[in-house]
């Protein structure tokens, strides 16, 4: 698997393209690219510009689906504690949240329109990790776009991890979509919610074939998780993570890596990537890459799905629904329901 230096650069650093290419395409082959790159923190317009430059490169390699990391638009606030301790929130932490809230995007909104235009312009299915702003609550969200430039929908992370829970809301069962497309059924789960067996089972029941796993986890153990999901679900797993150095975040005292700042230099790696593409048989098709910002691509033979399902179909012939079953509450969970709205809905259904 060659690592090929490309002429263009991003942030004045060389961008690498790691590509595992079949010698020929078939009608059941899809070229997939996962993007391993850092957000331009607190600068959403510049991050969108960077996303477009990366899409140009991916499209030039023939990518049909491109997956970006968790929270690429809006940023993953690695190392920050937002001034929180039990029973106390600091003024500096509240200001940090204000800035983070300002960098998030509305869905729908102008940034979503721009992402739609990018997907259509470069003729790719686009899976983009964003921080979604819904009033004054933020969600870690994945947006889906088709190659015609249409916004398909979103998935909100159902379970933020650890301190993420103080800044992100919890998604509900209404945003666990799997989209039927000409290149396969596409869905996504974000970072550690991929460790939730029931969420994965819901995805499998919806028939996911191209399972996107944007993440912020660059540990070796993450590779075991992605391989297990591919084998369990009989699906391709496309996992994209950011590669970031300390200098990719604002300097102190504006932004502080709690507990580790004194040990970091501007070039210290704070997120090592590890983006990877796994086949339904558990084979590594491309990656993992821990070297720097990269476009990691592979050709997906969709026939591998049927060959894998012959052995193991977790919601089909290898299930025991009369013994073990799952109920998914897939309706929105709104904190307030106005009776006038409910009455109108009831009247319309009579």
Curated annotation (Swiss-Prot):
Q: In which tissues is it expressed?
A: Highly expressed in leaves and cotyledons, lower expression in stems and roots.
Reactions catalysed, as given in the entry:
L-asparagine = 3-cyano-L-alanine + H2O; 3-cyano-L-alanine + 2 H2O = L-aspartate + NH4(+)
Work out whether the entry's keyword set contains Ribosomal protein.
no
Report the coiled-coil segments: none
In this chain the CN hydrolase domain maps to 30-302
Query: Which keywords does UniProt give here?
Result: Hydrolase, Lyase
EC annotation from Swiss-Prot or TrEMBL: 3.5.5.4, 4.2.1.65
Q: Which Gene3D superfamilies does the record cross-reference, listed alphabetically?
A: Carbon-nitrogen hydrolase
Instruction: Kindly give the CDD domains that the UniProt entry links to this protein.
Output: nitrilases_CHs
User: Family assignment?
Assistant: Belongs to the carbon-nitrogen hydrolase superfamily. Nitrilase family.
PANTHER family, per the entry: CN HYDROLASE DOMAIN-CONTAINING PROTEIN (PTHR46044:SF1), NITRILASE (PTHR46044)
Q: What does this protein do?
A: Involved in the cyanide detoxification pathway. Has nitrilase and nitrile-hydratase activity in the ratio 3.3:1, producing both asparagine and aspartic acid from beta-cyano-L-alanine (Ala(CN)). Can also use 3-phenylpropionitrile as substrate, but not indole-3-acetonitrile.
The protein's name is Bifunctional nitrilase/nitrile hydratase NIT4B
């Amino acid at each position: 698997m060659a690592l090929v230096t490309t002429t263009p650069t991003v942030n004045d650093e060389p961008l690498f393209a790691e590509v595992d290419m079949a010698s020929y395409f078939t009608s059941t082959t899809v070229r997939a690219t996962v993007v391993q790159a850092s957000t331009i923190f607190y600068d959403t317009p510049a991050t969108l510009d960077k996303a477009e430059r990366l899409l140009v490169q991916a499209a030039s390699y023939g990518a049909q689906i491109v997956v970006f990391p968790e929270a690429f638009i809006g940023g993953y606030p690695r190392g920050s504690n937002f001034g929180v301790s039990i029973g106390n929130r600091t003024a500096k932490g509240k200001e940090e949240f204000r800035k983070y809230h300002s960098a998030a995007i509305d869905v729908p909104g102008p940034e979503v329109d721009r992402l739609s235009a990018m997907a259509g312009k470069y003729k790719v299915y686009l899976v983009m990790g964003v921080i979604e702003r819904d009033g004054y609550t933020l969600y870690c969200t994945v947006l889906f776009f088709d190659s015609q430039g249409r916004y398909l929908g979103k998935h909100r992370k159902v379970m933020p991890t650890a301190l993420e829970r103080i800044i992100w809301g919890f998604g509900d069962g209404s945003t666990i979509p799997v989209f039927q497309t000409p290149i396969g059924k596409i869905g996504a789960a974000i970072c550690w919610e991929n460790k939730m067996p029931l969420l994965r089972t819901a995805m499998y029941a919806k028939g996911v074939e191209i399972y996107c796993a944007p993440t912020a986890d660059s540990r070796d153990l993450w590779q075991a998780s992605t391989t297990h999901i591919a084998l369990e679900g009989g699906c391709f797993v496309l996992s994209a993570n950011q590669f970031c150095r300390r200098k990719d975040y604002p300097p102190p005292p504006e932004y502080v890596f709690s507990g580790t700042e004194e040990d970091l230099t501007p070039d210290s790696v704070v997120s090592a990537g590890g983006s990877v593409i796994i086949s339904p048989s558990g084979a590594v098709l491309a990656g993992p890459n821990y070297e720097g910002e990269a476009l990691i691509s592979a050709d997906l033979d969709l026939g591998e799905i049927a060959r894998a399902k012959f052995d193991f179909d977790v919601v089909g012939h290898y299930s025991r629904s009369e013994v073990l079953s799952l109920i998914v509450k897939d309706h929105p969970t709104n904190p307030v329901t106005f009776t006038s709205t409910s009455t109108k809905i009831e009247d319309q259904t009579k």
